Amino acid sequence: MAPVSNQVGGHVAVLAFPFSTHAAPLLNIVCRLAAAAPSTLFSFFNTKQSNSSILAGNTSVLRYSNVSVCEVADGVPEGYVFVGKPQEDIELFMKAAPDNFRRCLEASVAESGREVSCLVTDAFFWFGVHMADDMGGVPWVPFWTAGPASLSAHVHTDLIRSTTSGGCHDEKETITVIAGMSKVRPQDLPEGIIFGNLESLFSRMLHQMGQMPPLATAVFINSFEELDPVITNDLKSKFKRFLNVGPLDLLEPPASAATTTPQTAAEAVAGDGCLSWLDEQKVASVVYVSFGSVTRPSPEELMALAEALEASRVPFLWSLRDNLKNRQLDEFLSKGKLNGMVVPWAPQPQVLAHGSVGAFVTHCGWNSVLESVAGGVPLICRPFFGDQKLNARMVEDVWKIGLRLEGGVFTKNGMLKSLDMLLSQDKGTKMKNKINTLKQFAKQAVEPKGSSARNFESLLEMTTTN
């Protein structure tokens, strides 16, 4: 992509949501935009803790002189004692976020001498539309970090609440009133739509957020149009612009801010070692296991998974965070009888793109699902929270590129059945064929004339030419 040369003095303010895995993909996109528009200043606002996490071991972002990484307060009052309430840290942050971001933006404008010309935010920041208006009506361009199905669910929250029973009367009830969601059941939806405490600050925030995308200059997402054409077309009809710009890991040039980076030297060594180990394995023979950076399966489920891997004798690569280990699991994994490799961290996009990997055991976070599609690797899904159950439903019943665990949790027998079905049966072969078709669509989408490449050009133009 040729750099944009006519951008002089533009200033794009980028507001990141500092929880879960929201901030890293947004910084990824900022670096791509910055590379293509070197005269535009990009100010990336995030909490100190989140910035430290996503920049640890990855200083390549610093090579962009037009990207300024800034800190915003986390909203926790001095001397505050956490009481253990669900989403307590998120609620504190969100209560203070509008004022904290405004103060940071004023300081950034004063320091740079450039007024903000475009506001890019995480889509969770529903107040972005008001901030953009207060800046003289600059474009507001929110980024949805999950998939199109979950965005559609939030946009249609009121319709869902008024037309479904929430599965209370019929467990097989599906959501037929929303385009592309006829296989989805109410119980698959993220908390805060029809389940959970709908009056909590977080649920009310999600509800407000779902009402704002039609007011945005554009909404962009890490996906590609060919994956969910029905949902994509429906959202296009409701938004001013809806831009699928992924999969980010396939876009050229390569991202300078990876969605996952090793946090320590030991993790970096482990990452290099597991790729060398994969080079020695047979094609499509390895089961890759990872639950991301946030999800915490129970000790009982982790033991059941380990026992199934041992009994199956299939080669496996398990990216297992140290904070998930316990004495029993550690002793089991140290017996030396397992036909695999356990590492504290793995370079997931590269692992899933490796020809020896034949299955992915995952929590079904959106980044993981999309990386699996880009690598052409079928999934075994054990979702936990957020959009993960919805993603798992799409994987199994809509795209037919994987399966959910029997009973919804890890058991030794259930996991063995899933491995056998995916690796040894005709159904698994069909899943592999379907995901390879999607993989080709994904590659075509990021080619120079592909849908995602064109959408990225549109995103670049609307964020840097004002």
UniProtKB/Swiss-Prot annotation:
The keyword Transferase applies. Its EC number is 2.4.1.115, 2.4.1.91. Pathway: Pigment biosynthesis; anthocyanin biosynthesis. An anthocyanidin binds at residues 22, 87, 154, 386. It holds the Pfam family UDPGT. The keyword Transferase applies. UDP-alpha-D-glucose binds at residues 145, 346, 348, 363, 366-368, 371, 387-388. Keywords: Glycosyltransferase, Transferase. GO terms for biological process: anthocyanin-containing compound biosynthetic process. The active site is at residues 22, 122. InterPro entries: UDP_glucos_trans, UDP_glycos_trans_CS. Induction: By de-achening. Down-regulated by synthetic auxin naphthaleneacetic acid (NAA). Optimum pH is 7-8 with pelargonidin and cyanidin as substrates. In the presence of other necessary color factors, this glycosylation reaction allows the accumulation of anthocyanin pigments. Uses UDP-Glc as a sugar donor, but not UDP-Gal or UDP-GlcUA. Anthocyanidins are the preferred substrates in vivo, but flavonols can also be glucosylated in vitro. Belongs to the UDP-glycosyltransferase family. This is Anthocyanidin 3-O-glucosyltransferase 1. The lineage of its organism: Eukaryota, Viridiplantae, Streptophyta, Embryophyta, Tracheophyta.
